[in-house]
């Protein structure tokens, strides 16, 4: 359900904005900062507050690379220095604590030589005072000592302790011990003073010194008695597994066993297998416990790099804050593009370890930094109670966080549960002073009220830019209040106030809001606040507005920036002045729009308050302005419900149910009907359903075509539907949302029909998933939501049933075994009768076929190489726009260049042209002959003949397959004398291939001048092992494959599915004595077909010469689908053979005619002759006078157009006379 999701998001956003505002500014003042600066000497490397004189604090700042002006250190190069700086103005002075003049010298033999070196000793690297800031220790961890034998120079380190000023400072070098305990395996590289802590309870006369370099850098803690130089016990040496742990890297004191005496906590950043840890010791250096990270430990995080002690939860027990500056956050940030977790390196973290009982730290709280490479936790310090809420707070330094990596300091407030998990304030170095501070937060200190306002202040060091800053804490103002409606409900039908002339009367109500504030610290008696009222702030579009005339009538009110409307604003601002401790109330009127859609969700509003700060950040009397307490709510919220028909409980619980069914069980691709209807029914069996929406997915490959809702009365209305996003989802689906009613009443049924249309460019190929669900803004019962969604799948199929049929015309041809036709034939009708094979390729549908191929293998030659079915024209295709054919062996079309008499063309076509006329541009280049080129006359003759047939009537044959389908026999044959009509083309023990025949050219020429080709076949016996000379490649079809295909068609009685080796590419008719006709068929829709007819003449002389007794001659056709719009498997190849039966008779006279036909023909001829004689006699034909014989002689040489008579009484023209044909000229 959608209710509540948007309000939760808005609430979360407002909370986040409030948090960010609190983080940016709370009560650490950043406008009036005292910034000290010294460049080039690491000024700010360490610092702490110290009461140099009673009641007069100063900020002691270390500069370990400084050139000291202490006269006792004259000639010492960069020994380092410590400065006492004012807390209220930018002035500092160097403090001289080293009273020894120069380096100490001792006799080495007879010479007095230095036994120590103070140059580059890093004096001021450690500055630490106690809790009361009346004792202080400053150290030089790189101080070197030569020992009594002057054999080594080792960095033992040294420290100076002072109280009540710096005049009586005393030096302690705990690692410098005689007799010689030098060397890295002892104390020589101890660097005593790397860290230090001064206890503050029960007058402990000790200082705790950290020495991380002793004993192969295992590290140690020294308890130095400030009254006795030699009273300096240290922690024990450990086994070698603790080498390089560097205990003493950081140090702090606190009571960890409940005895009231400060104990020691030492940081060990490389301990615990490089995870880091803390080690706790009593004041007498008795080990108590090890503390490790139990929240989110990882290698190299450097836990223990810093440490501080404070009671953060006000339970009277000291808690420990441990810094882990190199912690990497692997989980909180996602990549914007890939949404993968993106590691944030060196963000750092601090772990607050709460002491739940003496010596027991039972709870840990981790606070993680927010800036990569920032090293949050590099420095930590107890800050005191900054906001005066009774809980001590902590400050954390991240010297490389913030803008331009200039550093930042975070304020973490204590609480009864420990600390708040997020910082309350973030102070960036870029916002301090002139904005040029770098490494801000490298060193920290706090818990000292330097301005006397009763609130602790803090100081921050930044060694990289040479700065130390004192930041003051502002007094805190805590605001309380409430906002209430005048009644719990508002009815949009109760229009009780006139808004304006355009909107007329609307339903109006009042909001009552009251505020007051209290102060902590030195706060003024009255303050100005800005109030912001946001109406209906949980809704994306407001439904309630303040009245414009009310806004204009009050000068303290104005339209708020960012208000979603201006004429009648949804947000207003008002500036008010409040008196401390006194409540003040305000009344505002609003109206609810009568045209709102969401009548179920309450109208929420919020009132935010902010304090109006001055530019200087100070009040009259040079006092700091107060800060708003961000630990309490910064806004107040309430709501008013909208009256509805939900009963006394004011809660409507619908019971929605959706069902859906498609108008088909299977979706067929490529059909004319590419639209699918989805019938969706939504029923509400519960109470009113508000903002009821139907969501449905338009599957990939479909386009949305509209929706109609059919009511119970049969009327149709179109609900408003729109896509839920501008882009489809990752699966290519669009989701549409349709409004069904607001509300959809109880027991209402809405039936809808969704229309989707398959895309022509990218149709659906996978099963279609239909998803629909219904939703409303009011929640259902949990057990009724299962029927709010429906999902089902419709399979996708592609069916195009390709059919192939053929027939011969005529089905039988009679030929004489005794009479041969003329050898030198001139016309095509002189070589034999016409034989045509007609093939029909059809698409039964329902899906469309984009392209298909039809390959016809034509028996042009006999086994002896003679012409058999002599092709007289190129194939005829009807309709011509649906396909075209090409004769691959174009030399086999009318190879003798006979004159075509066109006897094969019917004079009266049985049916007129087809009703669909198409136009397709001819592409002659793609049909260019691949093998040979005919003479110009032959090409012209063939083209002229083809044009004649394709431009003539279209022959439409019956579609009845039973009439077209033919039984087929063998393609070509040899005689079997045992049984007539049972023939095979090749004996079982022979196989013919293209290379088994040799061609010889006959030099005789026909009358048209074309060369004749005579083929003399010489069949070869198969060699042993199945190999023979000229065997084709394995991917080429053999003649036996053609024979088997014809046999399959014959046994099946026509067309049959074929999975054999024959294909367009595998059959080479140049070697198999056939003619290959390639046809490409286009765009066959359901029930469309293409006819391909091949016209030939039976070359009877070949049958007579080869003494063929008769049988079947068959052509073979292969058809297959080659392309559709869909990537789906095609049907297998179809084959069929068309046969013409050859019937051999003894002679022409041998035809079995009835005797009475002969008698009748003689009598009719005699009667015609008698009638003709009588007619001529009556006309006097026999009585005419004949001229003399000599005058009848005709001289051909005198009359050029005369006829020549031959000895056989035949006449011919002079230019066509031939003695061999016409005989002797008379």
From Swiss-Prot:
Superkingdom per UniProt? Eukaryota
Q: Where is the composition biased (Basic residues)?
A: 1010-1026
- How is this protein positioned relative to the membrane? Single-pass type I membrane protein
What happens when you mutate residue 441 to D? In st567; severe paralysis at embryonic 1-fold stage followed by an arrest in elongation at 2-fold stage. Loss of myosin and actin organization in embryonic muscles
Q: What is its main location?
A: membrane
Residue numbers of motif Cell attachment site? Answer: 620-622
- In this chain, composition skew of type Low complexity spans 932-951
**Which regions are annotated as FG-GAP repeats?**
27-94, 108-171, 178-233, 234-290, 291-345, 362-421, 425-488
Q: What is this protein called?
A: Integrin alpha pat-2
Identify the species of origin.
Caenorhabditis elegans
As recorded in Swiss-Prot or TrEMBL, the protein's gene is named pat-2
């Amino acid at each position: 359900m959608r209710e509540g999701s948007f309000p939760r998001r808005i609430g979360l956003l407002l909370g986040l904005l409030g948090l960010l505002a609190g983080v940016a500014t709370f009560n650490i003042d950043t406008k009036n900062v005292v910034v000290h600066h010294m460049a080039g000497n690491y000024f700010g490397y360490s610092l702490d507050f110290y009461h140099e004189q009673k009641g007069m604090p100063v900020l002691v700042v270390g500069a370990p690379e400084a050139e000291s002006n202490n006269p006792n250190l004259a000639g010492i190069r960069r020994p380092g220095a410590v400065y006492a700086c004012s807390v209220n103005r930018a002035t500092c002075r160097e403090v001289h604590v080293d009273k020894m003049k120069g380096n100490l010298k001792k006799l080495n033999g007879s010479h007095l030589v230095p036994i120590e070196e103070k140059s580059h000793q890093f004096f001021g690297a450690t500055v630490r005072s106690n809790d009361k800031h009346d004792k202080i220790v400053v150290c030089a961890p790189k101080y070197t000592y030569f020992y009594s034998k002057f054999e080594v120079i080792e960095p033992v380190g040294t420290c100076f302790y002072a109280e009540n000023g710096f005049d009586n400072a005393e030096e302690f070098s705990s690692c410098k011990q005689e007799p010689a305990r030098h060397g890295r395996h002892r104390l020589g590289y101890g660097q005593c003073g790397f860290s230090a802590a001064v206890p503050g309870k029960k007058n402990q006369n000790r200082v705790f010194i950290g020495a991380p370099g002793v004993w192969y850098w295992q590290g140690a803690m020294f308890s130095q008695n400030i009254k006795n130089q030699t009273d300096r016990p240290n922690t024990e040496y450990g086994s070698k597994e603790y080498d390089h742990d560097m205990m003493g890297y950081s140090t702090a004191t606190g009571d960890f066993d409940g005895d009231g005496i400060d104990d020691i906590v030492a940081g060990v950043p490389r301990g615990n297998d490089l995870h880091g840890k803390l080690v706790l010791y009593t004041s007498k250096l008795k080990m108590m416990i090890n503390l490790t990270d139990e929240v989110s430990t990882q290698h190299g995080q450097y836990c223990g790099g810093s440490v501080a002690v404070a009671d953060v939860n006000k339970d009277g027990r000291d808690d420990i804050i441990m810094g882990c500056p190199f912690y990497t956050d692997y989980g909180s940030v996602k990549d914007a593009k890939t949404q993968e977790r993106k590691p944030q390196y060196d963000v750092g973290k601090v772990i607050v370890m709460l002491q739940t009982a003496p010596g027991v730290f039972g709870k840990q709280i981790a606070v993680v930094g927010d800036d990569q490479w920032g090293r949050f936790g590099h420095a930590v310090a107890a800050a005191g109670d900054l906001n005066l809420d009774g809980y001590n707070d902590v400050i954390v330094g991240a010297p490389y966080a913030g803008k331009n990596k200039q550093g930042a300091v975070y304020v973490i407030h204590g609480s009864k549960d420990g600390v708040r998990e997020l910082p309350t304030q973030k102070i960036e170095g870029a916002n301090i002073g002139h904005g040029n501070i770098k490494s801000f937060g490298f060193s920290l200190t706090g818990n000292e009220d330097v301005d006397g306002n009763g609130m602790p202040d803090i100081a921050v060091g930044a060694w990289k830019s040479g700065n130390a800053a004192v930041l003051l804490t502002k007094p805190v103002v805590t605001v309380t209040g409430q906002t209430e409606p005048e009644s719990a409900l508002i009815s949009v039908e109760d229009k009780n106030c006139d808004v304006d002339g355009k909107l007329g009367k609307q339903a109006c109500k009042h909001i009552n809001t009251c505020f007051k504030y209290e102060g902590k610290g030195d706060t003024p008696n009255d303050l100005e606040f800005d109030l912001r009222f946001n109406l209906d702030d949980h809704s994306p579009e407001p439904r309630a507005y303040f009245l414009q005339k009310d806004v204009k009538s009050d000068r303290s009110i104005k339209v708020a920036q960012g208000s979603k409307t201006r004429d009648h604003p949804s947000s207003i601002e008002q500036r008010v002045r409040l008196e401390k401790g006194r409540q003040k109330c305000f009344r505002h009127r609003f109206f609810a729009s009568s045209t709102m859609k969401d009548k179920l969700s309450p109208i929420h509003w919020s009132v935010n308050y902010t304090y109006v700060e001055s530019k200087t950040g100070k009040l009259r009397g040079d006092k700091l302005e107060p800060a708003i307490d961000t630990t309490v709510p910064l806004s107040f919220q309430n709501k008013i419900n909208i009256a509805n028909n939900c009963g006394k409980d004011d809660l409507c619980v619908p019971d929605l149910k959706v069902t859906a069914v498609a108008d088909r069980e299977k979706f067929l691709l490529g059909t004319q009907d590419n639209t699918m209807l989805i019938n969706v029914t939504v029923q509400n069996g519960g109470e009113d359903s508000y903002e009821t929406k139907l969501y449905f997915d338009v599957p990939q490959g479909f386009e949305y075509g509209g929706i109609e809702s059919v009511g119970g009365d049969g009327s149709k209305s179109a609900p408003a539907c729109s896509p839920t996003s501008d882009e489809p989802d990752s699966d290519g689906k669009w989701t549409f949302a349709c409004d069904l009613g607001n509300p959809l009443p109880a027991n209402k049924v809405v039936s809808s029909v969704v229309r989707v249309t398959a895309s022509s460019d990218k149709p659906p190929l996978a099963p279609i998933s239909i998803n629909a669900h219904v939703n409303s803004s009011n929640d259902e019962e949990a057990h009724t939501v299962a029927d709010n969604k429906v999902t089902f799948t419709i399979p996708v199929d592609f069916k195009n049933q390709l059919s192939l049929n053929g027939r011969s015309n005529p089905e039988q041809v009679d030929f004489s075994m005794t009479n041969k036709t003329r050898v030198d034939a001139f016309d095509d009708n002189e070589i034999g009768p016409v034989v045509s094979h007609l093939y029909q390729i059809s698409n039964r549908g329902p899906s469309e076929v984009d392209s298909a191929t039809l390959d016809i293998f034509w028996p042009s030659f006999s086994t002896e190489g003679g012409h058999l079915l002599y092709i007289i024209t190129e194939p005829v295709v009807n309709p011509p726009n649906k396909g075209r054919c090409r004769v691959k062996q174009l030399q086999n079309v009318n190879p003798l260049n006979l004159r075509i008499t066109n006897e094969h063309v019917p004079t009266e076509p049985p049916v007129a042209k087809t009703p669909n006329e198409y136009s397709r541009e001819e592409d002659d280049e793609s049909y260019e002959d691949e093998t040979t080129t005919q003479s110009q006359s032959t090409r012209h003759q063939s083209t002229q003949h083809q044009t004649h047939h394709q431009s003539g009537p279209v022959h439409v044959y019956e579609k009845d397959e039973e009439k077209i389908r033919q039984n087929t026999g063998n393609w070509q044959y040899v005689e079997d004398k045992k049984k007539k009509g049972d023939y095979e083309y090749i004996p079982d023990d022979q196989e013919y291939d293209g290379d088994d025949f040799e061609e010889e050219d006959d030099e005789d020429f026909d009358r048209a001048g074309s060369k004749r080709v005579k083929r003399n076949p010489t069949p070869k016996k198969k060699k042993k092992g199945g190999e023979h000379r000229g065997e084709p490649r394995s991917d080429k079809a053999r003649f036996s494959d053609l024979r088997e295909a014809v046999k399959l068609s014959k046994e099946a009685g026509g067309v049959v599915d074929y999975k054999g080796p024959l294909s367009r590419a595998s059959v080479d008719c140049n070697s198999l004595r056939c003619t290959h006709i390639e046809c490409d068929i286009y765009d066959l829709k359901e029930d469309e077909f293409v006819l391909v007819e091949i016209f030939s003449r039976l070359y009877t002389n070949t049958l007579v010469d080869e003494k063929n007794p008769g049988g079947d001659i068959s052509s073979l056709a292969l058809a297959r689908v080659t392309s559709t719009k869909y990537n789906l498997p095609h049907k297998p190849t179809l084959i069929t053979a068309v046969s013409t039966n050859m019937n051999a008779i003894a002679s022409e006279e041998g035809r079995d005619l009835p005797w009475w036909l002969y008698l009748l023909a003689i009598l009719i001829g005699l009667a015609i002759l008698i009638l003709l004689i009588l007619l001529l006699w009556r006309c006097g034909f026999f009585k005419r006078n004949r001229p003399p014989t000599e005058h009848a002689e005709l001289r051909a040489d005198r009359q050029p157009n005369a006829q020549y008579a031959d000895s056989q009484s035949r006449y011919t023209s002079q230019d066509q006379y031939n003695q061999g044909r016409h005989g002797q000229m008379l």
